[in-house]
Amino acid sequence: MAPALLLVPAALASFILAFGTGVEFVRFTSLRPLLGGIPESGGPDARQGWLAALQDRSILAPLAWDLGLLLLFVGQHSLMAAERVKAWTSRYFGVLQRSLYVACTALALQLVMRYWEPIPKGPVLWEARAEPWATWVPLLCFVLHVISWLLIFSILLVFDYAELMGLKQVYYHVLGLGEPLALKSPRALRLFSHLRHPVCVELLTVLWVVPTLGTDRLLLAFLLTLYLGLAHGLDQQDLRYLRAQLQRKLHLLSRPQDGEAE
């Protein structure tokens, strides 16, 4: 039992790292653009147009750096999700395979956020500066971001957050209960294999709904939108399963409790 108990601290460390990275990601994608905005460097008049920006090394260099960071994150996230890599990590790390995947993803995302280069002199796709837009647009964006993050946290709980973070696998292993996914129905497993990111719409809202969409933010939003779109493969069978599960849950919630029935 001692070797099994050693797995628990490793899984908890991975979870804490992922949780801290999630908090930092909220700050990076929401609080900084909504409360801090793009760092000023001479005001909007100092920003270049799109054609001029394509010839300016001071803009292209940080843009290429940010692109490299995003490709590093996407590459790690996709490579470790491949079946061959998952089989290899499962062979050598056993029940910690999911925790390892979560920890590596968190570290890759930390690199993106820590070394991200803003481009204050770059062109912007849109910007709310004139009143009343300078007051109401940030407020509307803030409300939509709060709603989106609340929905994201709620959906993660519904989609078995402990299993997604690798905690449930270790817990079941220590208690000798086997693999958690083995207890799920084939239709649920099929859905999970197609729906790698169950919070796609909410993340897209966070990425795109900002008062100022500058060059680096446009790169971040575009590439992550493209990646999220390619990672989804839902079909009609998955949608029918989701509809049936939703109807079943609504039916259970609408049933009167024992005390109320009496």
Swiss-Prot record:
Keywords, in A-Z order: Membrane, Nucleus, Transmembrane, Transmembrane helix
Residues in the Perinuclear space compartment per record: 29-58, 115-133, 211-216
InterPro entries (alphabetical): Nurim-like
Residue ranges crossing the lipid bilayer per the database entry: 5-28, 59-80, 98-114, 134-164, 192-210, 217-234
Main location: nucleus
UniProt superkingdom: Eukaryota
Cell location: Nucleus inner membrane
Membrane topology category: Multi-pass membrane protein
Nuclear side: 1-4, 81-97, 165-191, 235-262
One annotated Gene Ontology cellular component of this protein: nuclear inner membrane
Family as reported in the entry's similarity comment: Belongs to the nurim family.
Protein name: Nurim
Record lineage: Eukaryota, Metazoa, Chordata, Craniata, Vertebrata
